[in-house]
Amino acid sequence: MCSSDLNAVIEALRAGTTIDKIFIQKGETDKTLGHIASTARAAGVVVVDADKRKLDFMSRTHAHQGVIALTSVREYVSVEDILNIAREKGENPLIVVCDEISDPHNLGAIIRTAECAGAHGVVIPKRRSAGLTSIVAKTSAGAVSYVPVARVPNIPALLEQLQKEGVWVFGTAAEGTSDLYSADLKGPAAIVIGSEGDGMTRLVREKCDFLVSIPMKGKISSLNASAAAAILLYEAVRQRLGQ
């Protein structure tokens, strides 16, 4: 949801409402906006300086007061919560890690596929990523209500945490060291999906245990992020059904 009223944003912060990001107009010296920014940062909310044109576009009606807050459609969980869900089911964890997926339609489609494939959760970064917005919820066809989503400040650190928990990390890359069908996805697995434009970031790539490629037989050399996620998830499903 999108809120552009000063008092509504202040009350949302005071109430502890889960806020994805707060956009504040560049150059504004209003004390209330300054208070919102400092309170939000203290609460761990991402604050973005934006020009008036961007805020006008986001608010549609141009009726913002120099601030727009994007609130989540549901609460985020912790990574430990996701691991515990797998433990309670007696299953090897299957987790999707999104590395800077900024397109909400892609994120929604990934969450939808994760739900259908029985993944235990999805992880996104706080910055340079779409959050659990209404667009993501709509694109997911309601899957955001069922798939636990964790939000972390640092994806490389997250991957190290998962590895310490015995989870193997599989990154997707056109120049992967092995093809998808040689990868063993039956064990505890985290599948990392990079952004559609740039793929995985360098630090994330370096933390992966395996880099796998999807065989491409046509003239186009890449798939969009949600399609790549679907292929890897259902290869994991196929392998696990055959155990």
Each model region followed by its residue ranges:
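Active-site/ligand-binding-proximal alpha/beta "capping" segment
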Residues: 170-224
